[in-house]
Amino acid sequence: MGGLILSNSGMITSNYWLSEVYDAQITNAHKNGDLYIHNINMLTGCSAGWSLENLILKGLPSVNKMISSLPAKHLSTLCNQMVNFLGIMQNEWASAQSFAHFDTLLVPFIHQDKLSVKMVSDCLESFIYGINIPSRWGTQAPFSQITLDWNVPQEFINKKAIVAGCECDFTYGDCQKEMKILHDALFEVINKGDVSGRGFQFPIIALYLNPDFDWMHEEELFKACAKYGTPYFLTKEKQDVEGYFGYKPLCGSMGVVTLNIVRLAYLSSSKEDFFKRLDNVSDVALRSFEVKRQVLNQLLEAGLYPYTKAYISDFNDYYGTLGIVGMNEACLNAKWLKKGLMDLDAQTFSMEVLEFLNHKLLNQSQKVNLKATPAESVCTHFAQIDQELYPEIQSHGYYTNSTYLDVASTDDVFEALHIQQDFQNQYSGATSFPVFIDHGIADWKMVALLVKTIYENYDVPVFTITPTYSVCEEHGYLLGHQDICPKCSKSTEIYSRVSGYYRNLEDWNEGKQKEFSRRKTYSI
């Protein structure tokens, strides 16, 4: 019923944006498939980062005479407050709500109360289960994300820790020992999965790697990575990564638009013609950001987002986020190329496209970033529209995400990394490199070695280890892709990451299912 209500209200809201807010050029570009305006079924901004430090300092605020609370005195209380806060904010935003410095800001509570790993695990288990309850609109779990510093950051080392809204007589730097307790407890909960052996969708966990990372003494972390593909690995010194991997506090994305560059390439008579068309359609996208920002500011002032209003005064510091879909197919359909992204000429052209867009965005008066948009639905949406209008367009019924290689290109992860690292660093918003593994990995030390190798030898800002796993209703978790349970011979559920988080393969759209069937996983 919640999904039906969301669907019906979404159609009304989409019609409002397209008929009452956007002008004919923007509306037609969206309807015709030249571009796609994300979250058009919602009257909100996209994703946002919030200050966990502020929540610890002030507690939950009183808004419109609703229930408020004092700052948490204990970790168990704080975990409940975080669940409530993220659920509340999700109702005023369309996508990810994130906390940075999750571990750094929680460890003083462990230090103060001298909590054991078991006690911390119980608190975090409550948080994890609470955040996965379908409490947001449409009977969905809040789309939440947390970032782990792993080591206390330099800016926190000499800073007085905060517990119960007050400064303590110790600093965050005094809590490095408790960081290990929190990490072990968190990933112990992740490793258990739910009662049926399924992994937790949320929160999406991102972790900053560093040159001093203790690779061979983080068993719980790499077990979670091998079993459920958690976390995302961020290379902090290489790029200050934002996006759905966690915006900084009081920053985020107010809207996302993805460009159909496959159509642009197919219709263009030459490379020069392509860039003229790209310039024109990106102008339309940028104008849509200006319109949406104005509308959101008006609605914020009118009181439509009361909890958001308690923290920000406008959306002027929030990014418009531009993305592209189908670079591989664009190269295949370009008259001057006719080659996929494994080809050097296609790679050179793709870099020219990314550099063109980055140069254009840097010269904007408004804040706009370039993102490898997840676009799990848009990949199929664009391909279906184009197939009807232009039957000769080459595709497999979907377009490849952003500048990714075709999923059947190679089973050599290091070849793929070598090609992708230049592309990945062009995205100022968010991107990731997924290491797809179909068979699963039983040895956590092998995962640790793989992560270490990628971190030390390839310049990718974000990457994931993405094993496929299976679940039998009766026998629970099964390693790797197993369509039939070896114990009872019943059909299983297959799980893999679809553009950001894990979902049951049966719930993927038609295009993404086709992509999964063609996917050549990496040999590890």
Positions of PLM-derived features:
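Long, charge-rich boundary regions
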Residues: 473, 487-524
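Glycine-centered flexibility sites
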Residues: 323-326, 429, 500, 511
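Flexible, active-site-adjacent loop/turn segments at secondary-structure boundaries
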Residues: 100, 104, 262, 320, ...
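Extended amphipathic alpha-helical segments enriched in small hydrophobics
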Residues: 318, 322-331
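Conserved catalytic cores of very large enzyme subunits
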Residues: 1-316, 337, 343-494
